[in-house]
């Protein structure tokens, strides 16, 4: 039986964790693979180098969530990789092989004020939900609230009892409104790069700034009845191209 694209991504992570280059690259297009992870060189050669030159204890990965939207697979992973502990990855497939990869990461943090970690909560997409409708809701929310800055519309999109997984925060709409007023003093979100979803899960990767420096904003939402009921995510500074191991751009 042929492997699904998600199973192929699991094989990549298994190979990385085991230090097995052959396994990690089994479902990667060896001629066309484009790497956007700023800490790995381009192509299969760069991925091979990343695996072979990294200490084993820094490449231990465990899948938390995975879903597929067309040719894209989105994953949330925990473990150790390059000194980070929580990861979102995007893999793009063509003809059954991985041809492109983006990676985002942050350090682990203690449970937040409501007791949630960066990875707990539902792990399987609820496929009975309307994916296209949920993606549309999130795109409109992001464009209205985070890009245009119209915070008056937040209650239209966010449930009063929203569950939040960011470090240092508390659940609920009221807490989110307070936090956002502070956060937006130091950041801009200028452009959505990805809106990918399956069922009630919708993932967004956007580009903006934090304190004037280029920044990626990575968010996973769970949507129910056209409202955001749960959120995971983090910002990550985008390093200058001259400091990265490939020149394809992080996002």
What are these regions (language model features)?
Residues 1-251:
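C-terminal and inter-domain tail/linker signature
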């Amino acid at each position: 039986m042929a492997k699904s694209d998600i199973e192929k991504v699991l094989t990549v992570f298994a190979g990385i964790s085991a230090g097995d280059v052959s396994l990690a690259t089994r479902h990667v297009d060896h001629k066309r693979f484009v790497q956007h992870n700023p800490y790995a060189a381009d192509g299969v050669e760069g991925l091979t180098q990343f695996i072979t030159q990294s200490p084993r204890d820094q490449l231990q990965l465990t899948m938390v969530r995975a879903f597929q939207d067309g040719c894209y697979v989105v994953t949330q992973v925990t473990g150790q990789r390059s000194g980070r502990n929580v990861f979102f990855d995007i893999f793009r497939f063509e003809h059954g092989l991985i041809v492109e990869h983006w990676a985002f990461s942050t350090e682990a943090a203690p449970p937040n004020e409501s007791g949630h970690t960066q990875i707990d909560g539902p792990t399987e997409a609820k496929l009975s939900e309307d994916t296209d409708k949920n993606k549309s809701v999130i795109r409109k929310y992001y464009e209205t609230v985070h890009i245009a800055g119209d915070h008056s519309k937040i209650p239209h999109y966010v449930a009063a009892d929203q569950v939040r997984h960011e470090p240092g925060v508390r659940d609920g709409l009221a807490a989110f409104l307070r936090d956002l007023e502070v956060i937006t003093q130091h950041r801009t979100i200028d452009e959505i790069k990805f809106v990918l979803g399956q069922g009630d899960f919708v993932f967004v990767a956007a580009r903006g700034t934090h304190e004037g420096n280029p920044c990626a904003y990575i968010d996973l939402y769970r949507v129910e009845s056209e409202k955001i009921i749960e959120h995971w995510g983090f910002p990550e500074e985008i390093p200058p191209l001259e400091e990265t191991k490939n020149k394809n751009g992080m996002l």
